[in-house]
């Protein structure tokens, strides 16, 4: 699929009509915000005792701490109180990742765990609500700064309560691009590294901050012109996907297909810069 085909395939909203009413989407957003805020409280408290925290490896360079688990438990309690019949799909302990029926919340209780463990103040709590597989609402909180990014399907995206839009910069030479490094699979590292030179030569810079949920939020609010990563989990992606779409951006896989709430590759940006980045990544040249 070409970049232009991708733009047509991903018009900025879910292909399906929202499965929830406007009032239901607003109520689900309120739950997302409350749950994310509760998780963020736990993470902030954990940051104060960071040097003594217990943490372990889930896989190659993939870490989890007691704070991840405590944050997930806290946000799960908020969801259970408000929506006792809902399913929670979260990073540290979740049911079948293929669950799409009914009301499903998808959450990362601490996106940017490695940053958190090293005292780098760039990590988030992020959560989205889906109704019968269709994104309805999402919220991401930058725990270190307190910045809140929210969106509802068809209702737009907001930052600190104000509407937000993707960047209007269309010249790659003036653009700032975000990315995430592959770290656990050798074949993905081999695929990723050749992508860098073409993007580096044509843009004002590349940033790798280590928290995809915040990268996508920053695309949605116009700080970055575009973002790409070879593999994201549904909890990394769900809220950010809705933020970018509702802020007027495009988000697809590296194949140019509409981005699912699943383990997938991701290319996101303003319509012009998404098309440019997708072409550059696929062809190796602007």
Model-identified regions with their sequence ranges:
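Generic detector of well-ordered alpha-helical packing
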Residues: 69, 73, 92, 109-112, ...
